[in-house]
Curated annotation (Swiss-Prot):
One of its GO terms (molecular function) is RNA binding. Plays a major role in the shutoff of the host protein expression by cleaving mRNAs probably via an endonuclease activity. This host shutoff allows the virus to escape from the host antiviral response. Hijacks host RNA splicing machinery to selectively target host RNAs containing introns for destruction. This may explain the preferential degradation of RNAs that have undergone co- or post-transcriptional processing. Keywords: Decay of host mRNAs by virus, Eukaryotic host gene expression shutoff by virus, Host cytoplasm, Host gene expression shutoff by virus, Host mRNA suppression by virus, Host nucleus, Host-virus interaction. The record marks L28, L65, K202, K203, K206 as: Important for efficient shutoff activity. The record marks R195, K198, R199 as: Important for efficient shutoff activity and nuclear localization. It comes from Influenza A virus (strain A/USA:Huston/AA/1945 H1N1). GO terms for biological process: viral RNA genome replication; viral translational frameshifting. This is Protein PA-X. It is found in: Host cytoplasm; Host nucleus. The active site is at E80, D108. It comes from the Viruses. Pfam families: Flu_PA. InterPro entries: PA/PA-X, PA/PA-X_sf.
């Protein structure tokens, strides 16, 4: 699974996931499914934000990369992917500026158009079950919840899906692609089932010993939203050649 993650996701997303697991004292060599889940969640959050801006009239518009406008403001503030201290600093700043209610748990995004925090969920199970779990944990009507599944289903607070259909379809397609690529490598069952995951982990560790010197192909594309995080953790030279486009897992 670890090899798959490094092949399928952009190196910047992988690096953020590694830092997140390290911050919580988790070993990605052991918890490979969580490593994959974190990378997937990060990518969905960035794709959610991609290309969405607010113009001078306060209207939400979509602007593709290559059509810049200095007067435009990003519609979404990305909170996910930051270290906890910085994330809470951003949340506090938003609350002080907008008067929004401070959430009990760190949300993933803030929507400046709708003036609300957003919790993004990506589930391998039924969307309604995961939605209820999120709602019970957050216990706040102020935080908007939007759940995606690997089967193309989604569920959101009051059926308000925030994004246009095309933007959501891009996210669903990416998730379906990840599922297909996992399945083609025999990883999907272990990603869904904890019991199967333990068996797969033993197999992976044994395989890593045999293939430690094998070269690995890496996707070099990235989400434009990642560039917003860039100053915090990497220099611009490493992102200069990355194209902002929808990621696709490379074939073996």
């Amino acid at each position: 699974m670890e090899d798959f993650v490094r092949q399928c996701f952009n190196p910047m997303i992988v690096e953020l996931a590694e830092k997140a697991m390290k911050e919580y004292g988790e070993d990605l060599k052991v918890e490979t499914n969580k490593f994959a889940a974190i990378c997937t969640h990060l990518e969905v959050c960035f794709m959610y934000s991609d290309f969405h801006f607010i113009n001078e009239q306060g209207e939400s518009i979509i602007v593709e990369l290559g059509d810049p406008n200095a007067l435009l403001k990003h519609r979404f503030e990305i909170i996910e992917g930051r270290d906890r201290t910085m994330a809470w600093t951003i949340v506090n700043s938003i609350c002080n500026t907008t008067g929004a209610e401070k959430p009990k748990f760190l949300p993933d995004l803030y929507d400046y158009k709708e003036n609300r925090f957003i919790e993004i969920g990506v589930t391998r199970r039924e969307v309604h079950i995961y939605y209820l779990e999120k709602a019970n944990k957050i216990k706040s009507e102020k935080t908007h919840i939007h759940i995606f599944s690997f089967t193309g289903e989604e569920m959101a607070t009051k059926a308000d899906y925030t994004l246009d259909e095309e933007s959501r379809a891009r996210i669903k397609t990416r998730l379906f692609t990840i599922r297909q690529e996992m399945a083609s490598r025999g990883l999907w069952d272990s990603f869904v089932s904890p019991r199967e995951a333990k068996r797969q982990l033993k197999k992976d560790l044994k395989s890593q010993e045999q293939c430690a010197s094998s070269p690995t192909k890496v996707s070099r594309r990235t989400s434009p939203a990642l560039k917003i995080l860039e100053p915090m953790w990497m220099d611009s030279n490493r992102t200069a050649t990355l194209r902002a486009s929808f990621l696709k897992c490379p074939k073996k």
